[in-house]
Amino acid sequence: EKTLRIGLKKKLTISNDFSLIKDCNMIFVAVGTPQKSNGAIDLSMIRKAVETIGRVLAKSKKNPIILIKSTVIPGTMQNVILPILEKRSGKKAGKDFGLISNPEFLQESSAIRDTKFPHVIVLGGYQTKFMKKVKSFFSKLHPNVSIIITNHQTAEMIKYANNSFLATKISFINQLSNICQNIPGANIDDIAKIIG
């Protein structure tokens, strides 16, 4: 709530009117990609979002940069998002608009802090004028944070690798905790501090 109040004072606009994006220079897409009952990723929300963006872009004179923050499997940008945007807008990625993978690395308990103070910024896409603009934007916003520039597929995979690594760390620390319970005096908190 506090962050929202600050944003509103600084002219942050909240709206469900998608026509407003026709005047935007950057469009961040951060929608859910939950797991279906069969284990597959559900892309319905991201498909709907990029279809809407594509239709609005068709009527826009701007050349915006679209940044996809949602977690998607490798190949989704190339095989799903890009074709939808080009078809709906009638425009060409890399020429008429930029399309960049920009996965987020947020934890539920610290999402605002992680947004304000990221440990790394990943940008996936083609080396175009749009990529240069996005790199410049993030360099000014977070001057002391490493910016990794790669292709779409690698950026998408980085997000999955990061999630898997965090899950592995949690499982490992839980196993160590079980072991420590059987060793008198062993302190799992101290161990966790050392190994991260």
Please place each PLM-identified region on the residue numbering.
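Conserved N-terminal glycine-rich FAD pyrophosphate-binding loop of Rossmann-like flavoproteins
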Residues: E1, L67, I121
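Conserved N-terminal Rossmann-fold NAD(P) cofactor-binding segment
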Residues: E1-M26, G32-I41, L85-K91
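Glycine-rich, N-terminal phosphate-binding loop of Rossmann-like dinucleotide-binding domains
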Residues: V29-G32, S70, G125-Y126
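Rossmann-like NAD(P)(H) cofactor-binding subdomain of soluble oxidoreductases
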Residues: Q35-F105
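Internal alpha-helical scaffold of NAD(P)-dependent oxidoreductase catalytic cores
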Residues: P83-N102, L106-G196
